[in-house]
Amino acid sequence: MVRAERLNPTGIHWPNFMVADMAGRIVGAVQIRKHSDGSRELGSLVVAKDHREHGVASRMIDRLLEDEREPIWMITSEPYAEVYARWGFERIEPSAAPVKVRFNYRIGRLARIVSFFRRLPMRRLVILERLPVERRAGIKARRRPAPVEPMASTPAA
């Protein structure tokens, strides 16, 4: 399933996969790659074509991330970046990503060039980062402007 969708074949470690099973058939798969530099990357997300648009991917991601307390990165096509915001993923510059994630990003960009010559659809890739809930809350609190106190109303003369 992962190979059939032409996803990044590096870092596939089958024990790390979560699969969605329906009536004994695997209809989806996703993993968190654990890189040698300590970074972790959500990847190899795939759902069988006849089960797409039914929430299979969302349920797998919900389950996979529910107990995560460490930062996680992912590489996705630009049109899909906003979809992952619901799980706390935010777009970052490639230079801000860990070395191994940047390496996978570069592999993906090279694959795009091959796609161009094979006349396959090309999509721009982006890197997303998901911080732990505690750190996300702190960052959002710092970004939020201070509340403005309402002025006391005085009766008109």
Question: Where do the PLM segments sit?
Answer:
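Conserved acetyl-CoA-binding loop-helix of GNAT-fold acetyltransferases
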Residues: V47, E53-E66
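Conserved beta-strand in the GNAT
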Residues: V19, R25-K34, S39-V46
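Terminal substrate-recognition subdomain of acyl/acetyltransferases
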Residues: E78-A157
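Intrinsically disordered, low-complexity linear regions
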Residues: A29-V30, R59, E70
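Short loop/turn microsegments at loop-to-beta-strand junctions
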Residues: W14-N16
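Conserved GNAT acetyl-CoA-binding A-motif
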Residues: E66-P79
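Helix-loop element at the rim of GNAT/NAT acetyltransferase active sites that forms part
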Residues: M1-G11
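Short polybasic/polar patches that bind polyanions
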Residues: R3, R52, A85
